[in-house]
């Protein structure tokens, strides 16, 4: 009886180890240098979405933009938490609305706010563009091994962006 219990316990431990710990063995314990740069870009990309939506909430007046801008702030906070965990610089901390460290995002902000200012439908189309951009970037990042906290944050952002895309597409 004792031998059977011990054998069952050993087999159970082996199965748990093989199934439960195998994914952790492949997960990175710290973001790579490339992932660090991607996170820093991503937090600014989320700021771009938030700032464009805040601009439209004021100038185009649709409740969707105000609601989704709040969600984008949550996305920024989530990525800011990951950056803080690894003591990485957050490029959005001292930036005013519509001001970006990344020059490409700065140009994109100017172009998108102008493009979406013509009417509500143009603004919604800009929302679709932004969310498609976010989704593509997030899917590319999620293809790589990464720390669990980073994967969790990116998965949440991806789900949020999919929901935002659906809201702007209605």
Residue ranges and their predicted role:
Residues 1-11:
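Bacterial N-terminal signal peptides that target proteins for export
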Residues 1, 27-28:
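Intrinsic structural disorder
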Residues 17-25:
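C-terminal segment of classical bacterial N-terminal signal peptides
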Residues 28-170:
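All-alpha RGS (Regulator of G-protein Signaling) helical domain and cognate RGS-like helical scaffolds
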